[in-house]
Amino acid sequence: MKVQASVKKRCEHCKIIRRKKRVYVICKVNPKHNQKQG
């Protein structure tokens, strides 16, 4: 999981999820796209 200042969808399978005041991008098709804002 990459930690980035701004998270963006990188493909059509990515989903933006908010958990515990953090923003995540989760992608089951391509796990390289997983990101966390921090």
UniProtKB/Swiss-Prot annotation:
GO biological process: translation
Alphabetical keyword list: Ribonucleoprotein, Ribosomal protein
InterPro entries: Ribosomal_bL36, Ribosomal_bL36_sp
Coiled-coil intervals: none
UniProt entry tagged with the keyword Ribosomal protein: yes
Family: Belongs to the bacterial ribosomal protein bL36 family.
Name of the molecule in the record: Large ribosomal subunit protein bL36
Originating organism: Thermotoga maritima (strain ATCC 43589 / DSM 3109 / JCM 10099 / NBRC 100826 / MSB8)
Originating gene: rpmJ
